Structure formats: structure tokens, C-alpha cells
Amino acid sequence: MKRNSNRKPNEICINRKAKYSFSIKETFEAGIVLLGWEVKSVRCGKINISNSYISLKNGEMYLVNSQFDPISKSNLYITYECNRIKKILLRKREITYLYSKLYKSHLTIIVLSIFFKKQWCKVKIGIAKGKTIKDKREHKKLSEWKKTQNRFVKRIRH
């Protein structure tokens, strides 16, 4: 089976929609508070972060709109909240820096990927600005041009 070349071995989920819809200015690595069944679903890859973003409440950051599907609903005593708001673990100075970017510069904070670093589940977040339709078209043209260039180079080599 062929491996996905742009995916690192420890990355569980990548938000591919983010690079198309946003221009990413900076990236950060942060911890995330998860329950036991959520960690199991992350390890199995049953998560969706395509529409998720980071919000700020009472000086703390939270992951909103992410969906963690449970592996099995065999436990009758636990109610699984798939769209639960999860706390993001950052240092105080990082939170103040992100707060200033969020409200003063009118940027958004989005989730780029979820991965494991040793045994800890981490989130890669990015400060991003939304692209206009014109920017999206230019991005699409550029990516298609790079693909055709690579095809020509392959033909010349062989």
C-alpha cells in the first residue's frame, strides 16, 4: 500500500481544506484535553476537523466544531458527545499573542492537524486569513501548473 507523501507518520488527521480556504501566517503546537474514548477515536482516525476553529473564552482557548466519532457504543453508562468543546493547552503569553492577532488584526485561528508527540495528543493550529474567490482561483491554477510541470519533467527523464 502506498503511503501519502505529504503526511508525516505521526499525524492522525490533516485539515486539507485549510490550505485552500485560508492563507496561513503562523503555526503553533498546542496540547488538547481529551476524554478516554476521544483518545481512542483519535488513534483510530475517526475524527473530522475540516470545519473546526479556535475560540477564546475567559482567557482560555477552546476547540469548536470538531467531531470525534466513538469507536463503539457498547458502553451503556457513558453518553458520547461527539461535538464537545475541547480545551486547548497553551502558555499565557501565547494566548495573549493569539488574542491580539485574533481581534486587532482580524485574523482567525484554525486547526491544521492533530498528531501524537510521544504519547501526548497535540494540535497544530495556525493564524490564518480567509482567501477571496480570486485568490482561490490563482491557487488552483498554480497547483495545476505545478502538476503539469512535474509530468513533463517525468517524461523527459524517462
Curated annotation (Swiss-Prot):
InterPro entries from the UniProt entry: SmpB, SsrA-bd_prot, SsrA-bd_prot_CS
Keyword Translocase: no
Keywords, alphabetical: Cytoplasm, RNA-binding
Protein's GO biological process: trans-translation
Keyword Cytoplasm: yes
UniProt xrefs under PROSITE patterns: SSRP (PS01317)
Subcellular location: Cytoplasm
GO cellular component: cytosol
Entry-linked Pfam families: SmpB
GO MF, any single term: RNA binding
Domain of life per record: Bacteria
Function of the protein: Required for rescue of stalled ribosomes mediated by trans-translation. Binds to transfer-messenger RNA (tmRNA), required for stable association of tmRNA with ribosomes. tmRNA and SmpB together mimic tRNA shape, replacing the anticodon stem-loop with SmpB. tmRNA is encoded by the ssrA gene; the 2 termini fold to resemble tRNA(Ala) and it encodes a 'tag peptide', a short internal open reading frame. During trans-translation Ala-aminoacylated tmRNA acts like a tRNA, entering the A-site of stalled ribosomes, displacing the stalled mRNA.
Family named by the database record: Belongs to the SmpB family.
Protein name, per record: SsrA-binding protein
Species: Buchnera aphidicola subsp. Baizongia pistaciae (strain Bp)
